């Protein structure tokens, strides 16, 4: 085991003309400075279901591009099949983005019973417009506890797969249009139709839905 004092390290770095590199930690921008109080967590990490359209989960993730900077992918997942049923991609992180995702999910499904949608406490999801639309659709809104990603673990797992299998290999998309095309292909052609899940008995989301 080698021992070396900070002073010696500093001296050697100067002699060899070596400079340390400081990387600024990237911090996600918030669309609102308003402090959000805790809201009801109806799901409480109870992810299992007995059928479709009982529990949905929604979230956004950041996608970097060279020409357009950060872009935003918004999705909704049905927890029964783990299928992405709502999808929207935008250059702006706004309430319109998550509303568009919600409308795409509703268009793809027939809601007949009690349905919960679970999100974080982001300003887009706590907005009056979003919650008014949920009320109109008779969908109950559940929220993660602040700073607790485990409350939305299935969506966190989806984002991890997306980044590992689709985003990081690039490593940075040229522009918004390129990212949009690649992400759409990954979600709709691969993730929903071909990617097997151990939690689904090594079936794809589409196979589960067909069998339901």
Where are these regions (language model features)?
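Active-site beta-loop-alpha junctions of metal-dependent nucleic acid enzymes
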Residues: 69, 87-110
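An active-site-proximal beta-strand-loop segment
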Residues: 49-85, 91-92
């Amino acid at each position: 085991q080698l021992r070396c004092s900070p002073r010696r390290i500093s001296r050697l770095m100067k002699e060899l003309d070596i400079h340390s590199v400081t990387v600024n930690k990237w911090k996600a921008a918030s669309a609102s400075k308003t402090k959000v109080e805790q809201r009801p967590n109806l799901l409480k990490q109870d992810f299992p279901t007995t059928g479709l359209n009982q529990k949905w989960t929604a979230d956004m993730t950041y996608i970097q591009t060279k020409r357009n900077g950060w872009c935003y992918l918004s999705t909704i997942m049905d927890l029964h099949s783990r299928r992405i049923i709502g999808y929207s991609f935008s250059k702006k992180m706004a309430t319109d983005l998550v509303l568009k995702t919600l409308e795409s999910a509703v268009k793809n499904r027939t809601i007949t019973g009690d349905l919960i949608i679970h999100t974080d406490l982001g300003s887009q999801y706590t907005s009056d417009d979003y919650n008014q639309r949920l009320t109109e659709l008779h969908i109950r809104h559940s929220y993660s506890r602040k700073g607790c990603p485990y409350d939305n673990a299935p969506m966190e797992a989806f984002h991890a797969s997306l980044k590992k299998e689709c985003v990081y290999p690039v490593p940075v998309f040229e522009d918004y249009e390129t990212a949009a095309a690649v992400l759409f292909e990954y979600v709709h052609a691969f993730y929903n139709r071909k990617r097997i899940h151990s939690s689904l008995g090594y079936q794809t989301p589409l196979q589960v839905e067909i069998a339901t």
